[in-house]
Amino acid sequence: MLSLCSTSSLGMVATTTATQKFDARRLAGVSYPLGFFDPLGFTKGASKGKVKFYREAELKHGRVAMLASLGFVVGENFHPMWGGELDLPSAIAFQETPLQDWMPGLALLFAIHEFSSIWTFNSPFGGELWSIRSDYASGDLGWDPLGFKPKDPAALKEMQTKEINNGRLAMIAIVGMVGQELATGQTLF
């Protein structure tokens, strides 16, 4: 949140780019069975920078949801902390753990990551507000120590499509897991 509020005050050099429509159907993530999926029309008439902003947000949310889904399953089956006594639904267990000591550190980690993403935005001074620079590839953190990123553009697009689709599924899955636990009051696994 801090990075979103400070983006306008910490913007890069002013640019004067004209807003041009961009065809989002060419991006990774367009695949069978849904094809291009934008039911609310966010990308209709949007510029390339704005579409990249939406894609960046989708990737971040998808990555967090993939980790949350895994953490949900592991957390309900493995209880090494706090004496292993908290075998409760996640919504209740979260309130029973002494997380107040962890929250400032966790908030700091999120703030550092979000602060670093400020430099991916176009400047709001003369540029388009809430859009990503044209030289930045959405989701590319510039860190691939194991060399998983394919060199071939077709293979890269295929891998990006898999990540987008897995992230979309994970976002739906974590909402379903939390919803089911809240509705039944019991653990899932």
Model regions: which residues?
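Alpha-helical transmembrane segments and their helix-helix packing motifs
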Residues: 4-189
